[in-house]
Curated annotation (Swiss-Prot):
<dbReference type="InterPro" id="IPR019313">
    <property type="entry name" value="Mediator_Med17"/>
</dbReference>
<keyword id="KW-0804">Transcription</keyword>
<dbReference type="Pfam" id="PF10156">
    <property type="entry name" value="Med17"/>
</dbReference>
<dbReference type="GO" id="GO:0005634">
    <property type="term" value="C:nucleus"/>
</dbReference>
<dbReference type="GO" id="GO:0051123">
    <property type="term" value="P:RNA polymerase II preinitiation complex assembly"/>
</dbReference>
<dbReference type="GO" id="GO:0000151">
    <property type="term" value="C:ubiquitin ligase complex"/>
</dbReference>
<dbReference type="GO" id="GO:0061630">
    <property type="term" value="F:ubiquitin protein ligase activity"/>
</dbReference>
<keyword id="KW-0805">Transcription regulation</keyword>
<comment type="similarity">
    <text>Belongs to the Mediator complex subunit 17 family.</text>
</comment>
<comment type="function">
    <text>Component of the Mediator complex, a coactivator involved in the regulated transcription of nearly all RNA polymerase II-dependent genes. Mediator functions as a bridge to convey information from gene-specific regulatory proteins to the basal RNA polymerase II transcription machinery. Mediator is recruited to promoters by direct interactions with regulatory proteins and serves as a scaffold for the assembly of a functional preinitiation complex with RNA polymerase II and the general transcription factors.</text>
</comment>
<keyword id="KW-0010">Activator</keyword>
<dbReference type="GO" id="GO:0032968">
    <property type="term" value="P:positive regulation of transcription elongation by RNA polymerase II"/>
</dbReference>
<keyword id="KW-0539">Nucleus</keyword>
<dbReference type="GO" id="GO:0016567">
    <property type="term" value="P:protein ubiquitination"/>
</dbReference>
<dbReference type="GO" id="GO:0070847">
    <property type="term" value="C:core mediator complex"/>
</dbReference>
<dbReference type="GO" id="GO:0035019">
    <property type="term" value="P:somatic stem cell population maintenance"/>
</dbReference>
<dbReference type="GO" id="GO:0016592">
    <property type="term" value="C:mediator complex"/>
</dbReference>
Amino acid sequence: MSGVRAVRISIESACEKQVQEVGLDGTETYLQPLSMSQNLARLAQRIDFSQGSGSEEEEAAGPDGDAPDWGGAGADQDDEEGLVKFQPSLWPWDSVRNNLRSALTEMCVLYDVLSIVRDKKFMTLDPVSQDALPPKQSPQTLQLISKKKSLAGAAQILLKGAERLTKSVAENQENKLQRDFNSELLRLRQHWKLRKVGDKILGDLSYRSAGSLFPHHGTFEVIKNTDIDLDKKIPEDYCPLDVQIPSDLEGSAYIKVSIQKQAPDIGDLGTVNLFKRPLPKSKPGSPHWQTKLEAAQNVLLCKEIFAQLSREAVQIKSQIPHIVVKNQIISQPFPSLQLSISLCHSSDDKKSQKCAAEKPGQEDHLYVLEHNLHLLIREFHKQTLSSIVMPHPASAPFGHKRMRLSGPQAFDKNEINSIQSTEGLLEKIIKQAKHIFLRSRTAATIDSLASRIEDPQIQAHWSNINDVYESSVKVLITSQGYEQICKSIQLQLNIGVEQVRVVHRDGRVIMLSHQEQELQDFLLSQMSQHQVHAVQQLAKVMGWQVLSFSNHVGLGPIESIGNASAITVASPSGDYAISVRNGPESGSKIMVQFPRNQCKDLPKSDVLQDSKWSHLRGPFKEVQWNKMEGRNFVYKMELLMSALSPCLL
């Protein structure tokens, strides 16, 4: 067998990997073999650090044992060296375990020492005093020192905390003031239209999107505010974003509308500086650029309104032509009446402010008409947007409405002109100015009559629901103390643009012009008729009989204002009669007729011999009305009727 050549046989284990799981279908799941690092970790986990090493026990027992003989020392040492040489190692990680254990012990000791020194909870290090303290004072002194140190430590902790809080609050405030440019730009985009052109950010102030046709571009530029030093304290009104608007839109502007009775000389007209309003203040909490842009947009709108009014003033053909001089438009709605519309634009420079301060005058600006001008221009914008009609069907090209309606049923030129004829901005504002002036003149006339004439009383009840071209007022003429029985005169005045329409209680309608004298004469005649109507109502209440009544008497002196009214009433017994004549200018005249038997100055007649003729009423006698007692006309008349009525008792 020794001569046979050896054959190498490869022997493999039946299973190189451990089986983790065998499935129901016979599939085996194997565990992956450990890598070198995982194998090293598995071996390190087997280290038992609680067991002591044999070398430490021998070192501990060596000093305690007896010293060996000097004679046999060399032999024993050789024997031990031989044993050590041939003694196998107890464990390969023994030295590593020992070094880690000693390092852990040293780290624990170092941690304890540092904790005691830092926290001072477990130990307090005090310097050793040279002189020994008295036994009685030492405990109190130590206690006082410990209290002082504890209080000082607590105070230092509180001061450090307060300092940290102060720093945090200051940092928060600085962060709020130092707002980011992008966040401000986002806020600006929420309110205004922006677009980026190259490296610039441009915005739009115009009303083109709302239907405006004003040619001004109204473009502003958004810039970054770099005029502040970030190293210094930041002011409260600092904003990293700023806007740059055109120079012609800076400052503030408004449209002044005034009505003057006397027109000045045309040669004196020119560019007037009527700006008396303070510059708009920014709202609390709103950025300064918002106020700046709103003021610029308002200037642009005022310029558009004035341009539209100037264009219409030149184009409209009227009996009295409108005058346009620089920043003023002058019109005459009524004779001796002037309507002035001015564009007042004030920039932020000091010169314009000084000019406005040097020329104080009476404020006659009509804020209602200014507000109505803004409403009218917005309505004009809306009409511009709605005038474009979409084609039907949608695929058809755009075209004007009257072109699409042309055909067999097409309108002629006159019908088209009547449909398209609309009032302009200037015509509407002139009509509103006429109505406002006529309404104020009517109110002034009624107030002057009410303050000048005490009997009868005139009352005006203005309606709260009015139109821009029409207002209504209810006029009541009454006597004090007799309001329930004297309700005959009730007038409804409908104030229009050029006329006043008067509606009586019985439905009669009278048209009055814009002249103040016509309304005054009409009210005076109605007040005169009220006295006669009051006597009629009083006679019915007291049982007197009305013999005659007339609102327009043809006898007697002619009144320059209206006509006189008259009434004649008789007592219940028929013995007495009272005749009242009242005129707007002549006033009241009262006559009383007595029975013949009470008239001593009548001449005796030979014809009337029978006594029955003595019961007839004699001639009229005038009453001295000024000497009658009573607070008003109706009260005096009541006293007169009571005196002439027979006593029923």
